């Protein structure tokens, strides 16, 4: 599928529908905005999404979800498998969105990502909350031990 049709995924019932018809022109315009705003490297919005690199696919997905103006974004491993440049771009967009008041639930195995993007870290091990941490006062090593089952003395 083309990039612009991918941008409509999950949003057909809202922004891109007028009665029984899809508003392709609106989807194409939003796709061009996402390409520009999120620095998606592509020759155009009509190419297949599979033709993009993994990093550019991730940036397109983040842009698509942000364009929907959510009140909560669940970002599960948003930078897994992407290059350093795409990772930095995605991190910056998440920081901007959080600064604008978007609630972001970040799920990641990348400890530096968790510490760098979070304003609060909650660690769950085997279904139980084991730690409630301030990312400005935790090291990746400490966070890793909580992820492996160590319990914080007082968990909120």
Per-region residue spans from a language model:
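Glycine-rich phosphate-binding loops of nucleotide-dependent enzymes
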Residues: 1-156
């Amino acid at each position: 599928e083309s990039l612009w049709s991918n941008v409509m995924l999950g949003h057909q019932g809202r922004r891109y529908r007028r009665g029984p018809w899809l508003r392709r022109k609106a989807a194409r315009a939003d796709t061009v905005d996402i390409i520009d705003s999120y620095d998606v490297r592509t020759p155009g919005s009509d190419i297949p999404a599979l033709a993009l690199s993994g990093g550019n696919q991730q940036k397109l997905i983040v842009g698509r979800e942000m364009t929907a103006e959510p009140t909560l974004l669940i970002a599960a491993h948003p930078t897994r498998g992407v290059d350093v440049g795409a990772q930095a771009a995605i991190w910056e967009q998440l920081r901007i969105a959080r600064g604008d008041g978007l609630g972001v639930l970040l799920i990641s195995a990348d400890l530096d990502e968790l510490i760098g993007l979070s304003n609060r870290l909650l660690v769950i091990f085997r279904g139980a909350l084991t730690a409630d941490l301030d990312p400005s006062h935790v090291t990746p090593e400490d966070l890793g031990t909580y992820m492996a089952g160590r319990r914080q003395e007082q968990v909120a």
